[in-house]
Amino acid sequence: MTFSVPTQGKAFANISFLPYGVGPRDGGICLELHLGPYRILLDCGLEDLTPLLAADPGTVDLVFCSHAHRDHGLGLWQFHQQFPHIPILASEVTQRLLPLNWPDEFVPPFCRVLPWRSPQEVLPGLTVELLPAGHLPGAALILLEYHNGDRLYRVIYTGDYCLSHLQLVDGLALTPLRGLKPDVLILEGHYGNRRLPHRRQQEKQFIQAIETVLAKGRNILLPVPPLGLAQEILKLLRTHHQFTGRQVNLWAGESVARGCDAYQGIIDHLPDNVRNFAQHQPLFWDDKVYPHLRPLTDDQGELSLSAPSIVITTTWPAFWPSPAALPGLWTVFMPQLLTLPSCLVNFAWQDLEEFPKYELEDYLLADHSDGRNTTQLIHNLRPQHLVFVHGQPSDIEDLTSLEELQSRYQLHSPAAGNAVALPIGDRFVQPTPPPPQIYEGEIHELEPNKQIHHLGEVVIHLDGQILENSRWGKFGETGIVQARWQGEELVLRGISQRELLKQNQSSKRPVDFDCCANCRHFQHYHCRNPVSPLMGLEVRADGHCPVFESVASS
């Protein structure tokens, strides 16, 4: 969606924006920027270059790669092969990490490396400066400046960024950006307006969750993307004081191991504390000092369960083809906020439900900025135009609905294929905020049945237009909701499949135990047995009544 905003005063330059892909749903990030006479491509993470090839890409003047993640760089090698004359600019670390996206090919360095914090004139009148953006080693915030006579036009593209310091990369520094006042700011809205705990608090909670599971004698499986989060988790487990010297085996899947090897080659570009650690012991591979860390191949015969094991892998179906394939008790850790679709490749939720020796836990290790830090960055930069990309439509909508942004900036959130003109004027007219989405409905109360102690039910009917909202799929995933009072308002919350699975696991009982959890009439924590005095009531999983009927007998 793009908010049409009138701008009074003289239009100084032709700046326009055309996204070919604004997120994983489009096959990756690929953005085209027209700045003065120049046509500039910001990232190319497209799996299929067809939309780009249809737009005469041979006339592109420059390509910038913000960082090496697959959804920002996957299409660059194919693009370079077809148009080798077009320069692709990136940081040195990004150039080294990019080949990980094509593990089956020999990919020589094909990017032109730009230094940090040093403006470079790359075309007549056009300068570019790269600033470390956090999120991933080598990730860059790109500052473009075009000089046209007496006027300077400034565009900033954040790529993926994070203000917080991570284990292996320092966060984006705000001080050099303060008061830049770009004409256009293009930034990600990955986490929408969510407010997350501080990164160190997230790490503390993650370590506590790992500790709790290991104390139960269980092994841990972490399906993660191969670059970034995987190495963050391994470094955290290797260096945290609660794990130093502890007899735990860490295993890295094949693609994760390739990422670890690549990090070994960029140690000089990592934070000081990481370099100091690497001077005294290996950053990753170590079978001498606990916790041990070894690469894991497809041959499961190498997996030793003599000590508790933590397996971190992307290609986990090859490692764990079925729930019965591994001995011992296992807990699967899943991220609360998914950073890449590859976190969930072929994840078999139903298999976990069928095998009680497998449990599910979730964790939060955010590598993007939350809503609080997003607005902080915006207010420090003070742009005229604000273009949101790279996020779920509902999360982007949450950001563009903020009054503090609507009253100060011209907001845009275009879908793939929708061009946006960004006129630069000398005066700003506050845009009319979009109307809020309100869904009207009705409430019907069903009469109670005193004979069976049924308290009655309430049915809420809402307009069918609510189904068109992108949030509905997640809200209605299981068909189960929870309601609570918030002042005079009733708040409804959908129960996700993952949350329901955790509830089922926590309520499991031995099959020979006569309780509600093992009764054929136990549905969604309610009794549905017409001859039971508890019919229609919410019941505990360990409850019991005289008319119990076993699931096994049915």
Swiss-Prot record:
InterPro entries: MBL, Metallo-B-lactamas, RibonucZ/Hydroxyglut_hydro. To M.jannaschii MJ0047, MJ0162 and MJ1236. GO terms for molecular function: RNA endonuclease activity. Pfam families: Lactamase_B_2. SMART domains: Lactamase_B. This is Uncharacterized protein sll0514. It comes from Synechocystis sp. (strain ATCC 27184 / PCC 6803 / Kazusa).
